[in-house]
Swiss-Prot record:
Biological role: This is one of the proteins that bind and probably mediate the attachment of the 5S RNA into the large ribosomal subunit, where it forms part of the central protuberance. In the 70S ribosome it contacts protein S13 of the 30S subunit (bridge B1b), connecting the 2 subunits; this bridge is implicated in subunit movement. Contacts the P site tRNA; the 5S rRNA and some of its associated proteins might help stabilize positioning of ribosome-bound tRNAs.
InterPro entries: Ribosomal_uL5, Ribosomal_uL5_bac-type, Ribosomal_uL5_C, Ribosomal_uL5_CS, Ribosomal_uL5_dom_sf, Ribosomal_uL5_N
UniProt cross-references to NCBIfam families, sorted A to Z: PRK00010.1
CC terms in the record's Gene Ontology section: ribonucleoprotein complex; ribosome
Protein name: Large ribosomal subunit protein uL5
Amino acid sequence: MAKLHDYYKSSVVAELTKEFSYSSVMQVPRVEKITLNMGVGEAINDKKLLENAAADMAIISGQKPLITKARKSVAGFKIREGYPIGCKVTLRGERMWEFLERLVSIALPRVRDFRGVSAKSFDGRGNYSMGVREQIIFPEIDYDKVDRVRGLDITITTSANTDAEGRALLAAFNFPFRK
């Protein structure tokens, strides 16, 4: 079991129950899933770019990504409905906890000029979204084998009802919010 999951069960549940005065431990917010998304618009011209992006995402997440396709045609972007334009991975369970642990303790501190992540990126229902500009902040990615620096979107879906509860949950995991 991941250290962060143990920590959640042993300390965070008690902290949040006390802070928000929940009547049951089932009311305590928990991390339900983490979704990683990488849009590769340039894949229209070069299919190899999408394959490389999917390979990078598989290394980062530990599971095979789903290739996303365009939902509708957009003439301005020269894409047609059904064209492969990105990839995504949904992490749950043990892999989710391990990824969250690596993100907070290893990957985010490796970002250049890092001052913390914005505390305003909550969606109103306790879910947090953030973007990473370079996939090379993850230690699994070999810098010499990267063909192009790509960013990815990370969405952390929680069972929290409000942004305050979601922020308290992520802050309990030492999520580096900007002061």
